[in-house]
C-alpha cells in the first residue's frame, strides 16, 4: 500500500544543529510530522532529492537498511553529530579507491601512483571565485558549518547538493534523518529552520532523545536555526551585544580618569604659586596670616626702628630686641 502512495518529504528546510534534528525527531514521534515509509523510486528521485527536502524513517517499520538516491557522493566527513557528503562531478571509476587529492590537485591511486591531475572545483563562497579556481582564503566558520572539511579534496559538482544525516535510537529502534541542501540556498536564507515552522512551535524533545543517545558532541544549548538565515540572527546579536555595552559603560570611566589624574597635579601648583617668585619671607609668614601688622610693614624694610619696636609691643622684655628681630625675619 505504501509503495503505491506518493512519497512526501518529512520536512522542508535546513537542519542547523543537533537541537534542530531532535525537534524533527520529536515531531515525528508525537505525530506532528510523519516518517517516510520507503525509499524514493527511480522515477521519484528527480522531484524528491532536491535542496530543502528532509526525510526521516524508522528502520524497523520501513525496512530501509540503506538510504539510496542515485547520486554520486563523496566519502562522508564528521561535523559534530552529523555526517556530511557532497555531490561529485562524476562517480569514481570502478575499482578505484576513494582517495582525497593532495594540495597539488593530484589524486593518488590505491597502489600509491599518481594519476593525472583534475581541476579543483569549489562552491564559490568567496567573492571572485569561479569554477575551477582554488580557495585563496580559508573558508569562514559559517561555511564550515555547511560543508565541513569537504572543501576542495574531491571533484565536487558545481552548485551540487550536500547531504547531511544523523541517527538516534528510541526504545531500541533506530531512526534516521537525511537532509539535502544547496549551500547558496542556506546562505540566502531560503530554507527555514524547524523553529520557524508554526506546526513545531512548542515542540520540546523528550528526555530519552536528549540523554539516551551516543552523540559525539554535546547537544547545543539554545542554538536553533540556520547559521546564515534570519533565524540565527538573535544569537548573532547576543554575541555582539556584550561587546558594545561594556564599551559604553567604560567610556565615562575612561574620561573621568584623565580628568582626575591632572587635578592632583594642579592642586600643588596652586598652593606653590608663590614659589616661582622666590619670596621666602612670604612662605614663612603663610602660617602667621593672623599678624596683619607684620604684613602691612613688609613694604618698609628701611625703617628698622619700626621693625624693632613691633616685637616690643608683643614682648615687653628689655633684652629681647635681637631675639624678636630674628623671629621676625628668619
From Swiss-Prot:
Region feature (Disordered)? 93-123, 239-306
Query: Which is one Gene Ontology cellular component term of this protein?
Result: nucleus
Main localization, broad class: nucleus
Q: Give the induction note.
A: Expression is up-regulated during infection of tomato roots.
- Which keywords describe this protein according to UniProt? Activator, Nucleus, Transcription, Transcription regulation, Virulence
The UniProt family comment states: Belongs to the MIT1/WOR1 family.
Q: What is this protein called?
A: Global transcription regulator sge1
Source organism of the structure: Fusarium oxysporum f. sp. lycopersici (strain 4287 / CBS 123668 / FGSC 9935 / NRRL 34936)
Q: Which gene encodes it?
A: sge1
